[in-house]
């Protein structure tokens, strides 16, 4: 549920932190857009993307097999998925709805009529001998996604703002293929619904390519269209690169944002080098192996897919009002939410705002908490205290354990931060109510820590630690921290450490 956030919230050991830092540094050095790379003014860079996105449906696009393709190999397949004769496809309406949500979110023109075509090729991961896709009449066309100040790229480079916008050529609904592991094929993935989002070649920098992919991930997660993960293959990106209007080169097998950066840099340099040596470029498909792009096929031996309409599937005929109806049913857009959450009265950090957008349950929790707390530190209480408490205990965030109104009451209590953390930890660890935690930890009104109680505790500790007291009075003032530690342990964090520190210094007559 909140794994992406909680995984990064838990405290790490010093050695793990050092290892992570070294790894991050090495990765940054390898994947940095700027490192040892530049575009040459005389060789204009153009780029477009083809983004394959798995839709979050319970069943496959044309069968009732489940979409859990990471389970035991070939455990979620039907006769249709493996192309056995006598089986016919039946369109999953949930997949159509999610595809339409994506089309509306990307500002596309939803087509009143679309239909499916067969894309013929022979490969072990496609047992039917063809893929069902939408080549001639896609579901949606002519969309766009616009960059803004939240995307981390330079924008507004032309008066009409054209360079701020990436045009979407089309969105087509299609089925995924099986997955090949050496000589073995797993067909669990075969038939999972996909949308292919094809952009125009509007990218003039690698920064914009990355910004678009991240913005797209945020969008599909927020609208619950797809998990948005590149590492699991839920989103797969093919990159089209060309220089000076030469024939485009399609790069496949790209699985991370780092690979996107490095594949583009390598391919751009390869094309520039070819041209500077007097060579010519041809339309190609190339595979990325993590270091370089390798020729898969050229225009001369390109596959003729022999597209033709799928006679077993009817046309999709939609109401003229469908786009408007879906748009009005969607929640607030990511850009609108970011603008609202990063401005007054919330004033959230951009990273925190983006985390909220990708986790609807957490967003609802934060807004419910803020409606009661209504102070600038609301995000700190949620992110730095609440979520960290769950993460440190290795637990998944559960709103039922600490409801927003209960958390707001805890935050408003007349207790120091250490005491509030102690109560929160007790609630999460033992799954008890706030009242029960207060009672079990001794924070009831008649048990509340007072200055008089703190003074008495200090006197008691001084009397029972004469050796440490003698050391302090002989000039080793830092030894007072031992007494402070004993007092904190005795009171289980009911007082701030500074309270005891000041009292010990006062009672021992040291500065």
From Swiss-Prot:
<keyword id="KW-0067">ATP-binding</keyword>
<dbReference type="InterPro" id="IPR014746">
    <property type="entry name" value="Gln_synth/guanido_kin_cat_dom"/>
</dbReference>
<dbReference type="GO" id="GO:0032543">
    <property type="term" value="P:mitochondrial translation"/>
</dbReference>
<keyword id="KW-0547">Nucleotide-binding</keyword>
<protein>
    <recommendedName>
        <fullName>Glutamyl-tRNA(Gln) amidotransferase subunit B, mitochondrial</fullName>
        <ecNumber>6.3.5.-</ecNumber>
    </recommendedName>
</protein>
<feature type="transit peptide" description="Mitochondrion">
    <location>
        <begin position="1"/>
        <end position="6"/>
    </location>
</feature>
<keyword id="KW-0648">Protein biosynthesis</keyword>
<dbReference type="InterPro" id="IPR018027">
    <property type="entry name" value="Asn/Gln_amidotransferase"/>
</dbReference>
<dbReference type="Pfam" id="PF02637">
    <property type="entry name" value="GatB_Yqey"/>
</dbReference>
<dbReference type="GO" id="GO:0005739">
    <property type="term" value="C:mitochondrion"/>
</dbReference>
<dbReference type="InterPro" id="IPR017959">
    <property type="entry name" value="Asn/Gln-tRNA_amidoTrfase_suB/E"/>
</dbReference>
<dbReference type="InterPro" id="IPR023168">
    <property type="entry name" value="GatB_Yqey_C_2"/>
</dbReference>
<keyword id="KW-0496">Mitochondrion</keyword>
<comment type="function">
    <text>Allows the formation of correctly charged Gln-tRNA(Gln) through the transamidation of misacylated Glu-tRNA(Gln) in the mitochondria. The reaction takes place in the presence of glutamine and ATP through an activated gamma-phospho-Glu-tRNA(Gln).</text>
</comment>
<comment type="similarity">
    <text>Belongs to the GatB/GatE family. GatB subfamily.</text>
</comment>
<dbReference type="GO" id="GO:0050567">
    <property type="term" value="F:glutaminyl-tRNA synthase (glutamine-hydrolyzing) activity"/>
</dbReference>
<keyword id="KW-0809">Transit peptide</keyword>
<dbReference type="Pfam" id="PF02934">
    <property type="entry name" value="GatB_N"/>
</dbReference>
<dbReference type="InterPro" id="IPR017958">
    <property type="entry name" value="Gln-tRNA_amidoTrfase_suB_CS"/>
</dbReference>
<dbReference type="GO" id="GO:0030956">
    <property type="term" value="C:glutamyl-tRNA(Gln) amidotransferase complex"/>
</dbReference>
<dbReference type="GO" id="GO:0070681">
    <property type="term" value="P:glutaminyl-tRNAGln biosynthesis via transamidation"/>
</dbReference>
<dbReference type="InterPro" id="IPR004413">
    <property type="entry name" value="GatB"/>
</dbReference>
<keyword id="KW-0436">Ligase</keyword>
<dbReference type="InterPro" id="IPR006075">
    <property type="entry name" value="Asn/Gln-tRNA_Trfase_suB/E_cat"/>
</dbReference>
<comment type="subunit">
    <text>Subunit of the heterotrimeric GatFAB amidotransferase (AdT) complex, composed of A, B and F subunits.</text>
</comment>
<dbReference type="GO" id="GO:0005524">
    <property type="term" value="F:ATP binding"/>
</dbReference>
């Amino acid at each position: 549920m909140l794994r992406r956030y909680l995984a990064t919230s838990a405290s790490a050991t010093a050695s793990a932190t050092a290892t992570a830092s070294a790894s991050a540094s090495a990765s940054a050095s390898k994947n940095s857009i700027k490192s040892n790379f530049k575009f040459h003014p005389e060789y204009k860079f153009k780029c477009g993307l083809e983004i394959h996105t798995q839709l979050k449906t319970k069943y496959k696009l044309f069968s009732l097999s489940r979409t859990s393709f990471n389970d035991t190999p070939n455990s979620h397949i039907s006769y249709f998925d493996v192309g056995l004769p006598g089986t016919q496809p039946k369109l999953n309406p949930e997949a159509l709805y999610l595809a339409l949500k994506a089309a509306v979110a990307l500002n596309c023109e939803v087509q009143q009529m679309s239909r499916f075509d067969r894309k013929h090729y022979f490969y072990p991961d496609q047992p039917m001998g063809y893929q069902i896709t939408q080549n001639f009449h896609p579901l949606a066309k002519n969309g766009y996604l616009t960059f803004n100040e939240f995307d981390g790229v330079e924008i507004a480079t032309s008066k009409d703002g054209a360079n701020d916008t990436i045009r979407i050529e089309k969105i087509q609904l299609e089925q995924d293929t099986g997955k090949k592991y050496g000589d073995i094929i797993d067909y669990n993935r075969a038939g999972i619904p996909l949308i292919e989002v094809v952009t125009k070649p509007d990218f003039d920098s690698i920064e914009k390519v990355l910004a678009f992919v991240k913005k797209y991930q945020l969008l599909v997660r927020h609208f619950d269209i797809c998990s948005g993960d590149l590492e699991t293959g839920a989103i797969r990106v093919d990159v089209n690169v060309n220089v000076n209007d030469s024939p485009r080169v399609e790069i496949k097998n790209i699985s991370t944002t780092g690979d996107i950066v490095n594949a583009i840099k390598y391919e751009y340099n390869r094309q520039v080098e070819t041209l500077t040596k007097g060579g010519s470029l041809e339309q190609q498909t190339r595979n990325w192996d993590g270091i370089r792009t390798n020729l898969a096929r050229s225009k001369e031996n390109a596959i003729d897919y022999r597209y033709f309409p799928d006679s077993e599937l009817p046309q999709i005929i939609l109401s003229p009002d469908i786009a408007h109806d879906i748009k009005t049913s969607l929640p607030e857009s990511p850009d609108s939410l970011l603008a609202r959450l990063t401005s007054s009265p919330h004033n959230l950090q951009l990273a925190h705002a983006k985390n909220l957008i990708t986790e609807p349950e957490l967003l609802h929790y934060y807004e419910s908490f803020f409606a009661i707390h209504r102070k600038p530190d609301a995000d700190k209480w949620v992110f730095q205290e609440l979520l960290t408490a769950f993460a440190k205990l290795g637990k998944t965030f559960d709103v039922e354990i600490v409801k927003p109104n209960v958390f707001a009451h805890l935050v408003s209590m007349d207790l120091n931060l250490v005491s509030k953390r102690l109560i929160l930890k007790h609630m999460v660890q033992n799954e008890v109510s706030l009242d029960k935690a207060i009672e079990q930890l001794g924070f009831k009104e008649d048990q509340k820590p007072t200055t008089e109680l703190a003074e008495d505790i200090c006197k008691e500790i001084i009397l029972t630690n004469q050796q440490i007291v003698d050391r302090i009075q002989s000039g080793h003032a830092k030894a007072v921290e031992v007494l402070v530690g004993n007092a904190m342990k005795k009171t289980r964090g009911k007082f701030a450490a500074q309270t005891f520190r000041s009292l010990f210094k006062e009672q021992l007559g040291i500065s």
